[in-house]
Amino acid sequence: MIQKNWQELIKPNKIEFSSKKKTLTTLVAEPLERGFGLTLGNALRRVLLSSLRGAAVTAVQIDGVLHEFSSIAGVREDVTDIVLNIKEIAIRMEGDGPKRMVVRKQGPGAVLAGDIQTVGDVEILNPDHVICTLDEGAEIRMEFTVDTGKGYVPAERNRAEDAPIGLIPVDSLYSPVKKVSYKVENTREGQVLDYDKLTMTIETDGSISGEDAVAFAARILQDQLGLFVNFDEPQKEVAAEAVTELAFNPALLKKVDELELSVRSANCLKNDNIVYIGDLIQKTEAEMLRTPNFGRKSLNEIKEVLAAMGLHLGMEVPDWPPENIEDLAKRYEDQY
Protein backbone atom coordinates (compact mmCIF):
# COMPACT_ATOMS: atom_id res chain seq x y z
CA MET A 1 0.00 0.00 0.00
CA ILE A 2 1.56 3.27 -1.11
CA GLN A 3 -0.21 5.15 1.70
CA LYS A 4 2.17 3.56 4.19
CA ASN A 5 4.96 5.74 2.78
CA TRP A 6 3.46 8.70 4.63
CA GLN A 7 0.80 7.27 6.94
CA GLU A 8 3.25 5.26 9.02
CA LEU A 9 5.63 8.15 9.65
CA ILE A 10 5.29 9.51 13.16
CA LYS A 11 3.69 12.95 13.48
CA PRO A 12 4.12 15.40 16.36
CA ASN A 13 1.70 14.93 19.22
CA LYS A 14 3.03 18.15 20.77
CA ILE A 15 3.08 21.46 18.90
CA GLU A 16 3.36 24.31 21.39
CA PHE A 17 3.78 28.06 20.89
CA SER A 18 4.92 30.37 23.68
CA SER A 19 5.60 34.11 23.59
CA LYS A 20 7.79 36.07 25.99
CA LYS A 21 6.71 39.26 24.24
CA LYS A 22 4.51 40.25 21.33
CA THR A 23 7.30 40.06 18.76
CA LEU A 24 9.09 36.91 19.99
CA THR A 25 7.62 33.41 19.73
CA THR A 26 9.05 29.96 20.44
CA LEU A 27 7.70 26.83 18.73
CA VAL A 28 8.34 23.31 20.02
CA ALA A 29 7.28 20.33 17.87
CA GLU A 30 7.91 16.71 18.85
CA PRO A 31 8.32 13.88 18.08
CA LEU A 32 9.45 13.93 14.45
CA GLU A 33 11.07 11.20 12.39
CA ARG A 34 14.87 11.28 12.42
CA GLY A 35 16.08 13.97 10.04
CA PHE A 36 12.71 15.68 9.78
CA GLY A 37 13.63 18.28 12.40
CA LEU A 38 16.37 19.61 10.15
CA THR A 39 14.26 19.23 7.00
CA LEU A 40 11.22 21.07 8.35
CA GLY A 41 13.19 23.61 10.39
CA ASN A 42 15.31 24.72 7.44
CA ALA A 43 12.36 24.84 5.01
CA LEU A 44 10.16 26.82 7.40
CA ARG A 45 13.00 29.23 8.23
CA ARG A 46 13.67 30.03 4.57
CA VAL A 47 10.00 30.61 3.77
CA LEU A 48 9.43 32.67 6.92
CA LEU A 49 12.26 35.03 6.01
CA SER A 50 11.63 35.31 2.28
CA SER A 51 8.03 34.71 1.34
CA LEU A 52 5.58 36.33 3.77
CA ARG A 53 3.98 39.56 2.65
CA GLY A 54 4.19 42.78 4.64
CA ALA A 55 4.17 46.56 4.24
CA ALA A 56 7.04 49.04 3.98
CA VAL A 57 7.92 52.55 2.84
CA THR A 58 8.98 52.56 -0.81
CA ALA A 59 9.74 56.28 -1.30
CA VAL A 60 9.88 59.58 0.58
CA GLN A 61 9.64 63.20 -0.51
CA ILE A 62 11.06 65.84 1.84
CA ASP A 63 10.15 69.48 1.28
CA GLY A 64 13.16 71.43 0.01
CA VAL A 65 15.26 68.33 -0.69
CA LEU A 66 16.18 67.31 -4.24
CA HIS A 67 18.23 64.16 -3.57
CA GLU A 68 19.38 61.89 -0.74
CA PHE A 69 22.86 63.42 -0.53
CA SER A 70 21.48 66.70 0.77
CA SER A 71 21.45 68.16 4.25
CA ILE A 72 18.61 70.09 5.85
CA ALA A 73 19.09 73.26 7.89
CA GLY A 74 18.29 72.67 11.55
CA VAL A 75 18.15 68.88 11.18
CA ARG A 76 20.99 67.00 12.88
CA GLU A 77 20.89 63.99 10.56
CA ASP A 78 21.66 64.27 6.86
CA VAL A 79 19.15 62.89 4.36
CA THR A 80 21.05 59.60 3.94
CA ASP A 81 20.69 58.88 7.67
CA ILE A 82 17.03 59.91 7.59
CA VAL A 83 16.38 57.43 4.77
CA LEU A 84 18.10 54.66 6.76
CA ASN A 85 15.83 55.44 9.72
CA ILE A 86 12.76 55.44 7.48
CA LYS A 87 13.60 51.88 6.37
CA GLU A 88 13.15 50.73 9.98
CA ILE A 89 9.56 51.99 10.35
CA ALA A 90 7.36 48.94 11.08
CA ILE A 91 3.99 49.12 9.34
CA ARG A 92 0.83 47.04 9.23
CA MET A 93 -1.44 47.66 6.23
CA GLU A 94 -4.60 45.63 5.68
CA GLY A 95 -5.44 46.65 2.12
CA ASP A 96 -3.38 46.97 -1.04
CA GLY A 97 -1.14 49.94 -1.78
CA PRO A 98 0.28 52.26 -2.59
CA LYS A 99 -0.84 54.62 0.19
CA ARG A 100 0.43 58.02 1.34
CA MET A 101 1.46 59.15 4.83
CA VAL A 102 2.59 62.62 5.92
CA VAL A 103 4.52 64.01 8.87
CA ARG A 104 5.04 67.70 9.64
CA LYS A 105 6.85 68.85 12.77
CA GLN A 106 8.66 71.86 14.23
CA GLY A 107 11.70 71.77 16.50
CA PRO A 108 13.19 71.39 18.90
CA GLY A 109 12.80 67.65 19.41
CA ALA A 110 12.78 64.29 17.70
CA VAL A 111 10.52 63.36 14.82
CA LEU A 112 9.07 59.97 15.74
CA ALA A 113 7.32 57.34 13.64
CA GLY A 114 4.29 57.93 15.85
CA ASP A 115 4.11 61.55 14.58
CA ILE A 116 3.20 60.31 11.10
CA GLN A 117 -0.39 60.96 10.03
CA THR A 118 -1.65 57.65 8.65
CA VAL A 119 -4.68 56.74 6.57
CA GLY A 120 -7.39 54.34 7.74
CA ASP A 121 -5.89 50.87 7.28
CA VAL A 122 -2.23 51.79 7.92
CA GLU A 123 -0.80 51.38 11.43
CA ILE A 124 2.65 52.33 12.74
CA LEU A 125 3.89 49.52 15.00
CA ASN A 126 7.01 51.19 16.47
CA PRO A 127 5.78 54.73 17.22
CA ASP A 128 8.84 55.53 19.38
CA HIS A 129 11.26 54.96 16.49
CA VAL A 130 13.29 58.13 15.80
CA ILE A 131 13.36 59.36 12.20
CA CYS A 132 15.37 62.56 12.73
CA THR A 133 16.10 65.29 15.31
CA LEU A 134 15.20 68.98 14.89
CA ASP A 135 16.95 71.99 16.42
CA GLU A 136 15.19 75.09 17.71
CA GLY A 137 13.27 76.82 14.90
CA ALA A 138 13.70 73.97 12.41
CA GLU A 139 10.73 72.51 10.54
CA ILE A 140 10.35 69.47 8.34
CA ARG A 141 7.62 67.97 6.19
CA MET A 142 7.88 64.49 4.67
CA GLU A 143 5.47 62.50 2.53
CA PHE A 144 5.89 58.72 2.46
CA THR A 145 4.70 56.17 -0.09
CA VAL A 146 3.76 52.82 1.48
CA ASP A 147 3.11 49.58 -0.38
CA THR A 148 2.84 45.85 0.23
CA GLY A 149 5.17 43.14 -1.03
CA LYS A 150 7.46 40.33 0.10
CA GLY A 151 11.13 39.96 0.86
CA TYR A 152 13.63 42.73 0.17
CA VAL A 153 13.32 45.19 -2.72
CA PRO A 154 16.27 47.56 -3.35
CA ALA A 155 15.68 51.26 -3.81
CA GLU A 156 16.52 51.16 -7.52
CA ARG A 157 13.56 48.88 -8.20
CA ASN A 158 11.32 51.33 -6.34
CA ARG A 159 12.39 54.20 -8.60
CA ALA A 160 9.59 54.91 -11.09
CA GLU A 161 10.56 56.20 -14.53
CA ASP A 162 8.12 59.09 -14.23
CA ALA A 163 9.02 59.91 -10.62
CA PRO A 164 9.02 63.66 -9.85
CA ILE A 165 12.24 65.41 -8.88
CA GLY A 166 12.84 65.07 -5.16
CA LEU A 167 11.11 61.69 -4.75
CA ILE A 168 13.73 59.50 -3.05
CA PRO A 169 13.30 55.71 -3.41
CA VAL A 170 13.86 53.63 -0.28
CA ASP A 171 15.02 50.04 0.19
CA SER A 172 11.87 48.14 1.20
CA LEU A 173 12.08 45.48 3.90
CA TYR A 174 8.66 43.92 3.45
CA SER A 175 9.14 40.74 5.45
CA PRO A 176 7.25 40.87 8.77
CA VAL A 177 9.66 38.22 10.10
CA LYS A 178 13.00 39.67 11.21
CA LYS A 179 14.88 36.69 12.62
CA VAL A 180 14.38 32.91 12.73
CA SER A 181 16.57 30.36 14.46
CA TYR A 182 16.04 26.69 15.17
CA LYS A 183 17.70 23.74 16.85
CA VAL A 184 17.09 19.99 16.68
CA GLU A 185 17.47 17.68 19.67
CA ASN A 186 16.76 14.03 20.39
CA THR A 187 13.48 13.17 22.08
CA ARG A 188 11.86 9.98 23.32
CA GLU A 189 8.59 8.41 22.26
CA GLY A 190 7.83 5.13 23.97
CA GLN A 191 10.92 2.97 23.65
CA VAL A 192 12.40 4.96 20.75
CA LEU A 193 15.03 7.42 21.98
CA ASP A 194 16.21 9.10 18.78
CA TYR A 195 13.21 10.92 17.36
CA ASP A 196 13.70 14.63 16.59
CA LYS A 197 12.52 17.58 18.67
CA LEU A 198 12.35 20.86 16.73
CA THR A 199 12.57 24.19 18.57
CA MET A 200 12.17 27.39 16.54
CA THR A 201 12.42 31.02 17.67
CA ILE A 202 10.62 33.56 15.47
CA GLU A 203 11.01 37.33 15.84
CA THR A 204 8.54 39.53 13.95
CA ASP A 205 7.98 43.27 13.60
CA GLY A 206 4.65 42.98 15.44
CA SER A 207 2.46 43.08 12.33
CA ILE A 208 1.93 39.32 12.60
CA SER A 209 2.18 36.80 15.42
CA GLY A 210 4.86 34.12 15.31
CA GLU A 211 2.18 31.41 15.35
CA ASP A 212 0.41 32.91 12.33
CA ALA A 213 3.72 33.37 10.53
CA VAL A 214 4.52 29.65 10.91
CA ALA A 215 1.01 28.73 9.74
CA PHE A 216 1.34 30.89 6.61
CA ALA A 217 4.82 29.52 5.86
CA ALA A 218 3.56 25.94 6.22
CA ARG A 219 0.65 26.72 3.90
CA ILE A 220 3.06 28.08 1.28
CA LEU A 221 5.15 24.90 1.46
CA GLN A 222 2.03 22.75 1.29
CA ASP A 223 0.87 24.59 -1.82
CA GLN A 224 4.26 24.34 -3.55
CA LEU A 225 4.97 20.71 -2.68
CA GLY A 226 1.47 19.61 -3.68
CA LEU A 227 2.44 20.25 -7.31
CA PHE A 228 4.83 17.29 -7.17
CA VAL A 229 2.16 14.77 -6.11
CA ASN A 230 1.36 13.02 -9.40
CA PHE A 231 -1.20 10.46 -8.19
CA ASP A 232 -4.59 10.16 -6.57
CA GLU A 233 -4.71 8.33 -3.28
CA PRO A 234 -6.43 4.96 -3.69
CA GLN A 235 -9.59 4.80 -1.66
CA LYS A 236 -9.78 1.78 0.56
CA GLU A 237 -13.00 -0.12 0.09
CA VAL A 238 -14.83 -0.52 3.35
CA ALA A 239 -17.58 -3.02 3.87
CA ALA A 240 -20.95 -1.44 4.54
CA GLU A 241 -21.15 -2.75 8.09
CA ALA A 242 -17.76 -1.20 8.89
CA VAL A 243 -19.16 2.29 8.31
CA THR A 244 -21.27 1.88 11.42
CA GLU A 245 -20.07 4.10 14.27
CA LEU A 246 -18.14 2.23 16.92
CA ALA A 247 -19.06 2.80 20.55
CA PHE A 248 -15.37 3.23 21.41
CA ASN A 249 -12.09 4.62 20.11
CA PRO A 250 -10.86 2.48 17.14
CA ALA A 251 -7.37 2.63 18.68
CA LEU A 252 -8.58 0.12 21.28
CA LEU A 253 -8.60 -2.50 18.49
CA LYS A 254 -4.83 -2.27 18.21
CA LYS A 255 -2.91 -5.19 19.67
CA VAL A 256 -0.64 -4.52 22.63
CA ASP A 257 2.29 -6.25 20.92
CA GLU A 258 2.37 -3.29 18.50
CA LEU A 259 3.16 -0.83 21.31
CA GLU A 260 6.94 -1.42 21.26
CA LEU A 261 7.04 -2.23 24.96
CA SER A 262 10.03 -3.76 26.70
CA VAL A 263 10.30 -7.54 26.55
CA ARG A 264 9.40 -7.90 30.25
CA SER A 265 6.26 -5.76 29.95
CA ALA A 266 5.15 -7.45 26.73
CA ASN A 267 5.58 -10.92 28.23
CA CYS A 268 3.63 -9.97 31.35
CA LEU A 269 0.70 -8.76 29.24
CA LYS A 270 0.83 -11.90 27.11
CA ASN A 271 0.84 -14.15 30.19
CA ASP A 272 -2.19 -12.26 31.53
CA ASN A 273 -4.07 -12.83 28.23
CA ILE A 274 -4.16 -9.09 27.46
CA VAL A 275 -4.30 -8.95 23.65
CA TYR A 276 -5.84 -5.60 22.68
CA ILE A 277 -5.42 -2.08 24.05
CA GLY A 278 -9.11 -2.27 24.90
CA ASP A 279 -8.29 -5.18 27.23
CA LEU A 280 -5.40 -3.28 28.79
CA ILE A 281 -7.02 0.06 29.64
CA GLN A 282 -9.82 -1.61 31.59
CA LYS A 283 -7.26 -2.92 34.07
CA THR A 284 -6.57 -0.83 37.17
CA GLU A 285 -3.05 -0.13 38.44
CA ALA A 286 -3.64 -2.45 41.37
CA GLU A 287 -4.72 -5.27 39.07
CA MET A 288 -1.67 -4.77 36.88
CA LEU A 289 0.70 -4.85 39.85
CA ARG A 290 -0.76 -8.21 40.90
CA THR A 291 0.37 -9.69 37.56
CA PRO A 292 3.37 -12.04 38.09
CA ASN A 293 6.76 -10.38 37.36
CA PHE A 294 5.03 -7.05 36.63
CA GLY A 295 6.64 -4.24 38.63
CA ARG A 296 6.42 -0.49 39.06
CA LYS A 297 8.86 0.13 36.19
CA SER A 298 6.67 -1.79 33.74
CA LEU A 299 3.59 0.00 35.06
CA ASN A 300 5.14 3.43 34.46
CA GLU A 301 6.20 2.38 30.97
CA ILE A 302 2.67 1.32 30.04
CA LYS A 303 1.12 4.45 31.58
CA GLU A 304 3.48 6.62 29.53
CA VAL A 305 2.64 4.82 26.27
CA LEU A 306 -1.11 5.04 26.94
CA ALA A 307 -0.86 8.72 27.87
CA ALA A 308 0.73 9.46 24.49
CA MET A 309 -2.45 8.00 22.93
CA GLY A 310 -4.76 9.97 25.22
CA LEU A 311 -5.63 6.84 27.23
CA HIS A 312 -5.08 5.59 30.78
CA LEU A 313 -5.62 2.55 32.96
CA GLY A 314 -8.95 2.06 34.71
CA MET A 315 -11.12 3.23 31.81
CA GLU A 316 -14.58 1.81 31.16
CA VAL A 317 -15.26 0.69 27.59
CA PRO A 318 -18.88 0.06 26.55
CA ASP A 319 -19.62 -3.04 24.48
CA TRP A 320 -16.15 -4.51 25.01
CA PRO A 321 -15.06 -6.93 23.74
CA PRO A 322 -17.08 -6.61 20.53
CA GLU A 323 -18.11 -9.60 18.49
CA ASN A 324 -15.91 -10.37 15.47
CA ILE A 325 -13.14 -8.25 17.05
CA GLU A 326 -10.50 -9.51 14.61
CA ASP A 327 -12.55 -8.41 11.59
CA LEU A 328 -13.13 -5.00 13.17
CA ALA A 329 -9.41 -4.63 13.88
CA LYS A 330 -8.61 -5.19 10.19
CA ARG A 331 -11.29 -2.76 8.99
CA TYR A 332 -10.18 0.05 11.28
CA GLU A 333 -6.41 -0.51 11.15
CA ASP A 334 -5.88 2.70 9.14
CA GLN A 335 -7.51 4.76 11.91
CA TYR A 336 -5.03 4.01 14.68
Curated annotation (Swiss-Prot):
CC per GO annotation: cytoplasm; DNA-directed RNA polymerase complex
Q: Which GO terms describe its molecular function?
A: DNA binding; DNA-directed RNA polymerase activity; protein dimerization activity
Which region ranges are annotated with the description Alpha N-terminal domain (alpha-NTD)?
Answer: 1-232
Q: Which UniProt keyword terms apply here? A: DNA-directed RNA polymerase, Nucleotidyltransferase, Transcription, Transferase
In short, the EC number is: 2.7.7.6
Any Pfam family hit: RNA_pol_L
Region annotation (Alpha C-terminal domain (alpha-CTD)) maps to 248-336
Q: Which domain of life is it from?
A: Bacteria
- One of the GO BP terms on file: DNA-templated transcription
Q: Which SMART domains match?
A: RPOLD (SM00662)
Reactions this protein catalyses? RNA(n) + a ribonucleoside 5'-triphosphate = RNA(n+1) + diphosphate
Q: How does it assemble?
A: Homodimer. The RNAP catalytic core consists of 2 alpha, 1 beta, 1 beta' and 1 omega subunit. When a sigma factor is associated with the core the holoenzyme is formed, which can initiate transcription.
Q: What does this protein do?
A: DNA-dependent RNA polymerase catalyzes the transcription of DNA into RNA using the four ribonucleoside triphosphates as substrates.
Assigned protein family: Belongs to the RNA polymerase alpha chain family.
| Domain notes from UniProt | The N-terminal domain is essential for RNAP assembly and basal transcription, whereas the C-terminal domain is involved in interaction with transcriptional regulators and with upstream promoter elements.
Q: Which HAMAP family match?
A: RNApol_bact_RpoA
Could you identify this protein by its name? Answer: DNA-directed RNA polymerase subunit alpha
Gene that this polypeptide is encoded by: rpoA
